[in-house]
Each structure stands twice: as structure tokens, then as C-alpha cells.
């Protein structure tokens, strides 16, 4: 991992931190701010690779905000190129081998998943902006998704087990418990583990996984931001919120 000068870290994090603090809205000049940040970082003589990543992150966060976390469906396509640009700069190609980075509590700032955003639901039952969290345990074996609805009065959760694949970036997910407020709903135990391919000897997922299972690939990871792709083609951009809640 590159170690940029202290002044550069402070300059960049002031932009990113202000975005965190404001929760869901950036000023219309966010993209111009990113360009100004580029000048500041160049002046601080930061390593070029780190500089490029930080600028791409600030621009992506601005575009996520403009798309309303993905709720503005017609703006989603504009976010994809910014995601792909950052994925190409991924400093951690095998995130499963860096549990100290991948674990923790992450806050969702953009997704293309209508169900995660609650768009099919009545408006009061949609998650509050900035209140969709995902916690990954220290050993990367458990994940907890949390959302708050009804103006934050009710919390829904979904807990799942993670099984890593051999590529170092993909996990198979098996949900084992859901809760709606105080009501816990266990999921019947299902054999979701990987099977051994007779031809290659590699572990592969079952041909017909159950509906409460999925696949998630981490395509970008650093200390503050994560990008993941799901098996149904959905994109997820998350920022670090704090320590894991599982």
C-alpha cells in the first residue's frame, strides 16, 4: 500500500470526510471540487498512483450523490464509467487476503439494486437515505445487512454466512436469519457450500443455488471505500462507517 505525504492525506480526507458528514447531499460544485483537489495533491507531491485513486474516489462519490444512491434510475448509467475507472485502479486485487481492510461496518452510498433501495415498497417502508449498512465480521465468515425504515423507527436485518472462493475476491453468501423489527425469522438450513468439480478439482458453487443464496465479488477495496458486484449484475458502492457490528 502506498504511503502518501501527511499533508496530502489531510487535504484529500477533508473532502471525503465532508461528504461523509453531510450524509446524502453534496454541493452542485462537487466535481469542480474534485478538480481543485487534484491541484492541491499535485502541489503536495503525492505519489501519482495514490493521487489518481483519490481523485477517482471523490468523483465517484459525487456521482453517487447525484444519482440519489441509485434511486434516480435514469442517472445510474452515468455512474457506471466512474465505477469501472476506479475498479481499474484497485490496490487490493485479492481482498479476501486482507481481512483488516475488508472487515468492518460499511455504509451503502450507491446501488443498482431496486430491492436493496426498497423501490418496490410503499414509500414509508423504504430504507432511509444513508441508513443501509453492511457489517463484515473480522474473520470474513459472517455478514450482517441492516436498514432503517418508517423514519428510522424500525430496523430490518439479514444475516448471512460467507464461503470464500479460490480467486481471493469472491464469496458465496447463504442467508440464515432475517428480522423485521423485533421479529426474527430463521431460514431453514440449506446445503449452499461449494462442490468439487470432478474435471478441474476446483471448488465451484452448486448449479442451482437456493433463492436465499448469492455471490458477491469485491472489485475495489481500500481503507475508506469498497465496490462489489453481485451475481445478478448489481453494483454496490460503500464507504467505511466504523468497526464491524457482528
Task: Enumerate the predicted regions with their spans.
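Acidic, low-complexity intrinsically disordered regions
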Residues: 13-15, 32, 46, 102, ...
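N-terminal chloroplast transit peptides
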Residues: 1-32, 41
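Compositionally biased, intrinsically disordered low-complexity segments enriched
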Residues: 12, 39-42, 53-54, 136
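Soluble ligand-binding/transfer domains with enclosed cavities or grooves
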Residues: 49-246
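Intrinsically disordered, low-complexity linker/propeptide segments enriched in Ser/Thr/Gly/Pro
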Residues: 34-48
Amino acid at each position: 500500500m502506498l504511503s502518501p505525504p501527511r499533508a496530502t492525506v489531510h487535504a484529500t480526507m477533508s473532502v471525503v470526510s465532508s461528504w461523509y458528514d453531510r450524509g446524502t447531499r453534496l454541493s452542485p460544485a462537487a466535481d469542480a471540487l474534485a478538480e481543485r483537489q487534484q491541484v492541491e495533491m499535485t502541489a503536495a507531491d503525492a505519489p501519482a498512483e495514490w493521487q489518481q485513486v483519490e481523485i477517482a474516489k471523490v468523483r465517484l462519490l459525487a456521482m453517487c450523490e447525484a444519482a440519489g444512491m441509485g434511486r434516480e434510475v435514469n442517472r445510474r448509467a452515468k455512474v457506471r464509467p466512474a465505477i469501472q475507472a476506479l475498479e481499474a485502479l484497485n490496490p487490493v486485487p485479492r481482498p479476501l487476503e486482507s481481512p483488516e481492510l475488508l472487515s468492518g461496518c460499511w455504509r451503502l452510498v450507491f446501488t443498482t439494486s431496486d430491492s436493496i433501495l426498497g423501490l418496490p415498497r410503499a414509500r414509508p417502508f423504504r430504507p432511509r437515505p444513508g441508513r443501509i449498512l453492511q457489517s463484515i465480521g473480522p474473520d470474513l465468515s459472517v455478514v450482517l445487512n441492516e436498514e432503517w425504515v418508517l423514519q428510522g423507527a424500525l430496523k430490518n436485518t439479514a444475516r448471512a454466512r460467507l464461503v470464500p472462493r479460490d480467486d481471493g475476491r469472491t464469496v458465496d453468501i447463504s442467508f440464515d436469519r432475517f428480522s423485521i423489527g423485533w421479529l426474527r425469522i430463521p431460514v431453514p438450513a440449506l446445503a449452499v457450500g461449494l462442490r468439487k468439480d470432478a474435471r478441474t478439482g476446483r471448488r465451484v458453487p452448486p448449479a442451482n443455488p437456493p433463492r436465499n443464496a448469492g455471490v458477491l465479488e469485491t472489485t475495489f477495496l481500500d481503507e475508506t471505500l469498497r465496490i462489489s458486484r453481485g451475481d445478478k449484475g448489481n453494483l454496490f458502492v460503500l464507504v467505511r462507517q466504523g468497526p464491524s457490528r457482528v
